Amino acid sequence: PPDGIMVEIDGKPVCAGGLYIGVGTKFAFMEWIVTDKDANPRDTHKCLKKCIDSIMNMAKSKGMKLVYTATKEQALHKRYTKYHDMVLTESNVKTFLRDLDGSYSEDLTWISDDEQIDNLNK
């Protein structure tokens, strides 16, 4: 993403996330909320709060009125509604991608879930 936040403890990244801005709109997309799986869970919780709150503040500072995100991670579903005042708007979302020039289609594992990777390998 063009804009983003990384939260560290003692110089070690704990979590990060990005923000895409819809140019000419008041709409932003928060994406790629990732964590260090080896980090202490309490540290991860605190850092995620800071990261997501910072992304929301970044969106506000850029004049955005809406921030949208999508995730299959149940822990993030709960976090978004409990700690970040987000509203669940869709429950059964499937994501789609079109490679416009053919340069990315050879390996889509970086953006695919395990089920889709298994389907590609059949």
Can you describe what each PLM-predicted range is?
Residues D10-G11, D38, D99-S103:
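Short loop segments at secondary-structure junctions
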Residues N92-K122:
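C-terminal "cap" of GNAT-fold acetyltransferases
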Residues K12, D53, N57, S61, ...:
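Polar/charged alpha-helical tracts
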Residues P1-D10, V14-T35:
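A conserved beta-strand-loop-helix scaffold within acyl/acetyltransferase catalytic domains
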